[in-house]
């Protein structure tokens, strides 16, 4: 082959290769353009679909199925979901398992299912437990059989109480001696007519359940003592709560149950609705003398149950020594380190209450019954007639409904608009200051009157400067502000357990709490001027006013409309009690000197100091007290009174003794009730207190009202008495 022929073939090959390369580049370029076009069209269609308002929005599913969860795909609530149907394995579509929280690691997966799945799991679990219990050996005891015991069936998966006891021991009876069944279902009821059997020579009475209660149907009561996963315990509808987690729905429902039940259930009913130890219908035992009963008319609380805090007005006096014997001192010894305190019931019908050792909490606080060594003292109580023994009031549904009705009627209607409609005239502060001046001149000596007058004179120019530009409408608005603020403080006074009073800038009492009335003996109606004031205690050397001067002659005093020229047509009003009438001489002087500094000074300031409150005493009470003082003087001269003789002989109860004046002395660690508060200042008519008060101003920056909180100084008398006993 010649060189010229070879060169021609190579040139032809090069031409063909160039054409192929050009065709390939054109094909690649066309593919790229087509890809860009398709992507652009997809973006345009997606943008158009996103902006389309008629396009349905995808609803977020509560829980994805297992396949969609593994593929991180969007799922729906229906089962099988649409993706599983399209992919052809709809039979295997089921809810996916979420990652457990740390506090749910021990919970089974079935219990974490959404909706009612967990409830069905609990029912299947209960049924399985029943099958396992029925397949046990015939020789295994299924019931605790004893003539002296409750024939209750014990749950197979709860071993909180011992199950191997076959008879009542002679030792101390405690809660571990009972294998009772907890009511985990609302349908659980105990018959009220129960037969009695003998327990032991020292405890002769007992009760036994009816056959229906002793042998419950399978699957009805065989669960744990308190199953938190059972929504039927509180009638929760978990399916309607839209929770994906059973435990979360139950917790949310429990919080709602607690929040909606606050303040709606009376104390005597709140304990009877819970399935706790010692409550009504719980299969446990109550204490009433020497018997165990399921009847609500005879049931008393065991240990420190909630039903032990019943209303004090429904409790009869009980001698703890005759009821519990020597074991009554066990709890008293444990309470010796507790601080001295006063307790007031929530909503009493009156201010009369028993002493601390007569309260239901104190009578049921002993953790033991009589043992064999003290059986004689326990059997001696059986000779007492039934009418003389303590009987708990029957708690029935009509009484509870009536109690709820009374509570609802006492609630104040939350509507402040009536204040703006009722206030038509301004309040006559001028008449109030005139009455205060007359009272100060009548009660105090000239030297003390001068000190009070100097304190009031220092703030008088400020009062004149702030009120000289106010017209009648401003004064009416000022009174509306006062009434509106007082209306707001009434809820605080009722909710606060501290003795509280509210008075105007003239010192006239405008509001008072029941604790203050219990402490001082001043009735609310007397303090507000709605009833006559017959107090004769002015804090003198003897504690009482001597002579013919009487306080009832000027309180209540009709209001003179001519004193205030701008309200000539105002309705006459009665005169409330002044704050100065509640304090002794030194406390009154100190109060007005502090008031002169704080009235137009620090608007957020307060005063905290000590004072002596005067007890409310009438002429008849003063005569009785004078007679008791004579007996006390006779006792000091060597003639011991009957109370002092009893005290020397050691006739006291739990450390609370009575002195020669018939006044009860409360020992350390006791909680005195209203009776103990009434005894404060019984002899000299003065109650040593520490109090904190502040001045609240109105919109015109004028002192509007004085809010005062009082606290008893009971620690110092206890300390001084302890030093006297040591010496």
Curated annotation (Swiss-Prot):
CDD domains: GAL4 (cd00067). It comes from the Eukaryota. Keywords: Activator, DNA-binding, Gluconeogenesis, Metal-binding, Nucleus, Transcription, Transcription regulation, Zinc. Residues 1-62, 129-224, 264-297, 353-399, 533-567, 627-666 are annotated as: Disordered. Residues 380-399, 543-553 have a biased composition (Low complexity). The keyword Heme does not apply. InterPro entries: ERT1_acuK_gluconeogen_tf, PAS_13, Zn2-C6_fun-type_DNA-bd_sf, Zn2Cys6_DnaBD. It is found in: Nucleus. Residues 65-93 bind DNA. GO terms for biological process: cellular response to starvation; gluconeogenesis. One of its GO terms (cellular component) is nucleus. Residues 1-32, 129-213, 267-277, 361-379, 639-661 have a biased composition (Polar residues). GO terms for molecular function: DNA-binding transcription factor activity, RNA polymerase II-specific; RNA polymerase II transcription regulatory region sequence-specific DNA binding; zinc ion binding. It holds the Pfam family PAS_13. Residues 39-55 have a biased composition (Basic and acidic residues). SUPFAM superfamilies: Zn2/Cys6 DNA-binding domain. Belongs to the ERT1/acuK family. Transcription factor which regulates nonfermentable carbon utilization. Activator of gluconeogenetic genes. This is Transcription activator of gluconeogenesis TRV_01442.
């Amino acid at each position: 082959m010649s060189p010229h022929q070879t060169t021609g073939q190579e040139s032809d090959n090069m031409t063909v290769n160039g054409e192929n390369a050009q065709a390939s580049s054109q094909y690649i370029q066309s593919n790229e353009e087509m890809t860009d076009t398709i992507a652009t069209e997809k973006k345009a269609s997606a943008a158009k679909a996103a902006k389309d308002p008629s396009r349905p929005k995808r609803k977020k599913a509560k829980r994805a199925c297992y396949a969609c969860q593994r593929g991180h795909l969007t799922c729906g609530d229906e089962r099988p979901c649409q993706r599983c149907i399209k992919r052809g394995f709809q039979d295997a579509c089921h809810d996916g398992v979420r990652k457990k929280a740390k506090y749910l690691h021990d919970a089974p997966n079935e219990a974490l299912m959404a909706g009612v799945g967990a409830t069905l799991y609990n029912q299947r679990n209960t049924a399985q437990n029943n099958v396992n219990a029925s397949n046990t050996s015939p020789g295994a005891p299924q019931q605790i059989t004893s003539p002296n015991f409750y024939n209750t069936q014990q749950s197979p998966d709860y071993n909180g109480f011992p199950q191997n006891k076959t008879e009542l021991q002679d030792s101390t009876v405690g809660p571990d001696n009972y294998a009772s069944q907890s009511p985990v279902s609302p349908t659980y009821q105990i018959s009220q007519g129960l037969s009695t059997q003998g327990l032991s020579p020292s405890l002769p009475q007992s009760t036994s359940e009816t056959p229906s209660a002793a042998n419950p149907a399978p699957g009805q009561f065989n669960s744990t003592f308190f199953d938190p996963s059972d929504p039927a315990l509180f009638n929760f509808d978990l399916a309607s709560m839209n929770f994906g987690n059973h435990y979360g729905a139950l917790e949310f429902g429990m919080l709602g149950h607690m929040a909606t039940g606050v303040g709606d259930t009376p104390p005597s009913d709140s304990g009877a609705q819970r399935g706790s130890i010692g409550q009504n219908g719980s299969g446990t035992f109550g204490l009433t003398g020497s018997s165990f009963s399921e009847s609500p008319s005879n049931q008393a609380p065991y240990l420190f149950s909630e039903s032990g805090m019943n209303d004090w007005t429904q409790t009869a006096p009980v001698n703890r020594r005759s009821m519990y014997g020597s074991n009554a001192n066990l709890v008293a010894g444990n309470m010796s380190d507790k601080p001295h305190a006063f307790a007031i019931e929530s909503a009493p019908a009156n201010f009369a209450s028993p002493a601390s050792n007569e309260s239901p909490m104190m009578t049921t606080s002993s953790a033991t019954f009589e043992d064999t060594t003290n059986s004689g003292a326990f059997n001696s109580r059986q000779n007492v007639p039934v009418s003389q023994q303590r009987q708990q009031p029957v708690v029935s549904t009509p009484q509870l409904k009536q109690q709820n009705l009374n509570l609802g009627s006492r609630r104040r209607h939350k509507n402040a608009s009536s204040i703006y409609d009722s206030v038509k005239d301004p309040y006559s502060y001028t008449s109030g200051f005139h009455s205060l001046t007359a009272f100060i001149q009548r009660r105090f000596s000239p030297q003390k009157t001068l000190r009070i007058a100097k304190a009031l004179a220092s703030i008088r120019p400020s009062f004149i400067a702030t009120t000289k530009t106010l017209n009648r409408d401003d004064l009416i608005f000022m009174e509306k502000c006062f009434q509106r603020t007082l209306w707001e403080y009434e809820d605080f006074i009722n909710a606060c357990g501290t003795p509280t009073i509210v008075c105007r800038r003239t010192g006239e009492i405008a509001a008072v709490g029941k604790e203050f009335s219990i402490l001082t003996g001043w009735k609310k109606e007397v303090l507000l001027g709605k009833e006559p004031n017959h107090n004769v205690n002015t804090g003198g050397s003897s504690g009482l006013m001597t002579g013919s001067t009487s306080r009832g002659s000027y309180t209540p005093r009709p209001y003179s409309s001519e004193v205030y020229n701008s309200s000539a047509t105002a309705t006459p009003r009665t005169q409330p009690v002044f704050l100065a009438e509640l304090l002794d001489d030194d406390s009154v002087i100190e109060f007005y000197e502090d008031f002169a500094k704080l009235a137009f000074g620090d608007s957020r300031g307060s005063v905290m100091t000590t004072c002596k409150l005067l007890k409310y005493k009438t002429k008849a009470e003063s005569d009785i007290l004078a007679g008791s003082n004579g007996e006390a003087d006779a006792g000091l001269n060597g003639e011991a009174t009957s109370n002092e003789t009893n005290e020397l002989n050691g006739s006291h109860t739990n450390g609370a003794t009575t002195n020669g004046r018939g006044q009860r002395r409360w020992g350390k660690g006791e909680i005195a009730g209203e009776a103990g508060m009434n005894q404060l200042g019984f002899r000299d008519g003065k109650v040593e207190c520490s109090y904190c008060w502040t001045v609240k101003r109105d919109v015109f920056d004028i002192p509007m009202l004085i809010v005062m909180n009082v606290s008893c100084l009971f620690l110092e008398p206890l300390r001084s008495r302890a030093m006297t006993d040591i010496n």
